[in-house]
Regions:
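Short alpha-helical segments that sit at the start of domains
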Residues: 1-13
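A short alpha-helical element within helix-turn-helix/winged-helix DNA-binding domains
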Residues: 25-36
């Protein structure tokens, strides 16, 4: 499994917000500067997190982004799936004349995806931010 660049940007921003720990909204230009990310790409990465209910986007002069729940209650699986979609064990393309082999490989890939989902579900945003 490989995370998209957008997912990486989202994780950088979420870790920053979690490390702040005060629950106050942080403006996107500040997050972008702190993490060395283009603000345009940052907003693109944060929009699906707002839709998924992981972030709140607050308008106005003192607005910005803040976590919708405590960092201890947000798993990496939620973040990855909000950005990149479900973690799956798909195999690209079919193997010529290898139906049985393809079936066995599919089982291996699905097992690996199950392990990845389980592990991502165990790790919390607070773990990335070094907060408990």
């Amino acid at each position: 499994m490989m995370l998209s660049r957008t997912c990486g940007y989202a994780l950088l921003a979420l870790e920053y917000l979690a490390a702040q720990g005060d629950g106050q909204p942080v403006a996107s230009p500040l997050i972008a500067r702190a993490r060395g990310i283009s603000e345009r790409f940052l907003v693109k990465a944060l929009t699906p997190l707002v839709r998924a209910g992981l972030l709140l986007s607050l308008k106005g002069p003192s607005g910005g982004y803040r976590l919708a729940r405590p960092a201890t209650k947000i798993s990496l699986l939620e973040v990855v799936e909000a950005i990149d979609g479900p973690v799956r064990g798909d195999m690209p393309g079919a193997l010529e004349g290898g139906d049985r082999l393809e079936s066995r490989l599919h089982a291996v890939c699905e097992g690996a995806a199950d392990l990845m989902r389980r592990r991502l579900g165990q790790v919390r945003l607070s773990d990335l931010a070094g907060k408990k």
